[in-house]
Every structure is written in C-alpha cells, then in structure tokens.
Design a protein with these regions (language model features):
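Hydrophobic beta-strand residues in large extracellular and virion-surface proteins
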Residues: 7-11, 83-85, 108-112, 139, ...
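Extracellular/virion structural assembly segments
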Residues: 99-105, 113-147
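Polar/charged side chains located within well-ordered beta-strands of beta-rich proteins
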Residues: 81, 87, 104, 157, ...
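Small/polar-rich, solvent-exposed N-terminal microdomains that initiate assembly or binding
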Residues: 1-99, 146-155
C-alpha cells in the first residue's frame, strides 16, 4: 500500500460520527457530512456527474460535479463535497552511524473543495464558507485523533505510520466557478525502517 492510499483510507475509516461532530466539534446540523475522499492518481476511483464509476482511458480525465445532489458513494460519502489527497514529496534520513535504519517523512496535501451559489443548498456565499470551515474542522479532528500513528489495512495489505501531523493551510478559491477550497498540509512519519 502506498502512502496516498493510506491517507485516503485513514480519512474514510476514521471520519467522526454525527454525534461527535455535534457534541465535540459544534458543527451545525447542515454541515455534519462525510465528503468524498479521492486519491488524485486513481482516475477510476472518481465518479462522473451521474454518479457512475468505471475505467478511464489514458489521457482522459474523470469529471466530478460538486453540484451532484446524489452522492457518488465513493467511500460511503454522504455529500458531494470533495477532499482530494496527493503526495507532495518524501524525505529519508539515516540516523545511525552504520546507516542500518531509515526514517521516512511524507509531505501530503488534502485539498478540500466545496461549492457555493448556483446550487440548491443555499442562497448566499455564507453557506459555502461555513461548509468549508466545517469540513476543515472535521478533517483536523480526524488527523489529530490519529497523530500518534495508526495502522491501515486494506485486504491483506497494511501500512503503519508512527506520527501524523497537521500542518498549515492555504485558501484555494475560484471565484469565477464559485468554488471554495483549502489546501491542508499533512506530514506522515515512519521511524527505524530496516535497510
């Protein structure tokens, strides 16, 4: 299992329940959702605008509609809001004199996307801002609850990270398309990997 798949599955498996969103995080009822979490490299994991899935030919892109009222049901999502996960880079260090072990650090990005205006969910942009902030708070809670490491298993394949840190965030808005977004940096670390 690669690191991007690990983070996608970690978010899907550990997204908090609506009661945690309400009681612990204070998220308004309209924003207690589970967004679609996708690996940017896996073109067949996306959903077209009608919610269907399938293989995509080389050179083609999968279209994803944030206005789709019917959730594409990728990873048990309950809304068409989107978190795209991708790896920015990796760094290795060798902390021993004999170079017998390696520490690995992975820089990841979780790109949160939601839409405001032009959809049936709201009449103004406040809804989009509130939705984006709510998804960010839930993402932050999910990552911080796993900060001391976690093992993710898919079938017979498993991977353990020893530390997961939430980093900075930057806005990524597209006013012309009325898209709101945050790019959130996540660092995942593995220690003492035998060489």
């Amino acid at each position: 299992m690669d690191e991007t798949t690990y983070l996608v599955q970690l978010l899907r498996d550990n997204w908090p329940s609506t009661s945690v969103m309400e009681d612990t995080l204070g998220i308004a009822a309209a924003h207690r959702i589970k967004p679609t979490v996708l690996d940017i490299r896996n073109l067949s994991s996306g959903a077209s605008t009608d919610g269907s899935t399938g293989k995509v030919s080389r050179g083609q892109a999968r279209q994803y509609s944030l206005l789709n009222k019917l959730s594409p049901a990728v990873g048990s999502a309950t809304s068409s809001d989107l978190i795209i996960v991708y790896e920015d880079g990796q760094d290795n260090t060798y902390p021993t004199i004999d170079w017998s072990v390696r520490n690995e650090s992975y820089s990841m990005t979780c790109h949160i996307r939601t839409v405001s205006g032009g959809d049936t969910r709201a009449a103004d942009n406040i809804y989009g801002h509130d939705r984006l902030e709510s998804i960010y708070k839930i993402l932050r809670y999910t990552i911080e609850s796993q900060r001391k490491g976690s093992t993710v298993t898919i079938g017979s394949d498993s991977l353990k990270m020893h530390q997961i840190h939430l980093g900075g965030r930057t806005e990524s808005n597209n006013k012309a398309k009325r898209l709101f977004g945050y790019k959130v940096n996540v660092t995942m670390k593995r220690f003492a990997i035998s060489v």
